[in-house]
């Protein structure tokens, strides 16, 4: 079975730049990987922030690597899920990630992969299958 899997920013960042469960997930061909415009914007900001002390060329290479990794992932435009912002706001108080949850509500993935614990509430877990990378890998093997 091919699962539709929404990837949060922290999963993308770890999967692109580090070896581990997240990078293994990005390499699984049998998954329909999806993320949101907001997650991608956050990813690009995080890459620039984490590498700000390195040379401009190193940052360019890291951003190019990011774009290459994103080429295999469906990126849902913000305009598609803005109507879900109010619903997301009722489920979560962590304002920064309300757009991410709105995208998840719109996309309705089989799994929502994240390392952010504020998504692992009973209220959110009733609506979407929230899971971390470590627990997700055994399910698809």
List the predicted regions and their residue ranges.
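Short, well-structured N-terminal submotif of metal-dependent ribonuclease cores
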Residues: 1-36
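Acidic active-site catalytic centers that drive phospho-/nucleotidyl reactions
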Residues: 8, 97, 116
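PIN-domain endoribonuclease scaffold, especially VapC-family toxins
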Residues: 28-29, 34-86
């Amino acid at each position: 079975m091919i699962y539709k899997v929404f990837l949060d920013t922290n999963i993308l960042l770890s999967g692109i730049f580090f070896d581990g469960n997240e990078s293994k997930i990005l390499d699984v061909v049998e998954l329909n990987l999806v993320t949101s415009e907001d997650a991608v914007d956050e990813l690009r900001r995080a890459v620039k922030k984490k590498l700000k002390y390195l040379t401009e060329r190193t940052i360019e290479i890291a951003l190019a690597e990011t774009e290459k990794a994103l080429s295999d992932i469906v990126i849902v435009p913000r305009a598609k899920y803005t109507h879900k912002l109010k619903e997301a706001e009722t489920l979560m108080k962590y304002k920064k990630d309300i757009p991410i949850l709105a995208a998840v509500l719109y996309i309705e993935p089989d799994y929502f992969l994240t390392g952010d614990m504020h998504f692992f509430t009973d209220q959110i877990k009733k609506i979407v299958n929230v899971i971390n990378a470590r627990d997700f890998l055994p399910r698809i093997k």
